[in-house]
């Protein structure tokens, strides 16, 4: 037998042994759970667009209990729906769980020059979070309120045209146009509305569709293939919608830098405070690349952290990218679910309209007025409970071997929350957990957070940074719609909604009628 055949045989046996070792990880640990297939584990379930894997978690929870183990390609994941366990991981033991599950296409969170808030970890995450936080303060939200209001008015014009036809419309399409337009204007330097003519929308939609997930599936099973695909997409971004969008952002940043240089040469002083996210991040731009040095630092709450308030050029691209995707998809979905639930619960919709009429009597709606819409806030929170968004990112990576409530977790193991089961747990929500009941929030939400039972925006130090912006957008748009229209179901409305997706769970469509409240 030739030497080459011996080497090939040894490599094959080693390769096979490695994957069987990973696949059998939870069997050796004595932890229950679905096994799937060697090499793959259950990763194929998470890429079934028509039958979302995130909903499959609930089926497995019923079979294996509130804590069980799965493998996803080369990743080992503990799935949990025990509220106390979730709170322990996300809050109390954050020092041991400050990372997130990653995919080779995303790159190494410590070395990827375009790492963003969702991907970054350790000191780098701390720095990015510190720099981005002022963008989402109440002071900043008040400043962009007028821009959001202008976008709302533009969408209302399109909804008026749709309502006049007397037919049901897919509100998900309208809400996606709305949220992308807002992000474009407050984050990307877009100076006018591009609603229903935005060239970026097809690219963004593709990221969340079935076809956009295949590279991640391959990379999850064969990491080296993911690394090679990442290098290919970086060199040829047109082959990937995500990398194509980042390429567009790079051009927008360079254009803004050129404008700044031209203004400086002409003696034009900056207009004062940053006008959008690009300005904010460019003001914090660093002239040096310190990422490699930063990745060697330790990370713990007990350390005295001095945060260097600078961003690299590539990090700015990363932040804009994640703000675009997160701000576009989740808010559009939340609006869709809220509208559907109001249409199917007319008594709740009527109560909400009464609050809107009382608190917002004028055509123009102010920041202070929407802050007084307490029942609307209850409606949105309850919609987010019944249809949790982006729950695939409700995970943490164990960065240091530890013990959580008697369960030993090895370094490198992921902890994934079964958010859908958690949000319907009768022990947290009561026997009416399956009912749409906004009134459950009228006493506040602190108790539900404290129990570890509510994760619409995540939990702990890594909770979604943009949740206040999302709430402002949603409350403002719903106020304008409900002042003028009533959401009604039609023969085209799918009841219950048909849910699809992978990274996020989306309705296939939300076909509703907009019935005018007052005749002209």
UniProtKB/Swiss-Prot annotation:
Q: Name one GO molecular function term.
A: monooxygenase activity
Q: Which cofactor does it need?
A: heme
> From which organism does this entry originate?
Caenorhabditis elegans
**Residues that bind heme:** 464
Protein name stated in the entry: Putative cytochrome P450 CYP13A4
In its keyword annotation, does this UniProt entry include Metal-binding?
A: yes
- Name of the encoding gene: cyp-13A4
Q: What class of enzyme is it?
A: oxidoreductase
Alphabetized UniProt keyword annotations: Heme, Iron, Metal-binding, Monooxygenase, Oxidoreductase
InterPro entries found in the cross-reference section: Cyt_P450, Cyt_P450_CS, Cyt_P450_E_grp-I, Cyt_P450_sf, Cytochrome_P450_3A
- Report which superkingdom the organism of origin falls in: Eukaryota
- Family designation: Belongs to the cytochrome P450 family.
Which EC numbers does the record give? Answer: 1.14.-.-
Q: What does this protein do?
A: Cytochromes P450 are a group of heme-thiolate monooxygenases. They oxidize a variety of structurally unrelated compounds, including steroids, fatty acids, and xenobiotics.
Q: Which PROSITE patterns match?
A: CYTOCHROME_P450
Tell me yes or no: is Heme among this UniProt entry's keywords.
yes
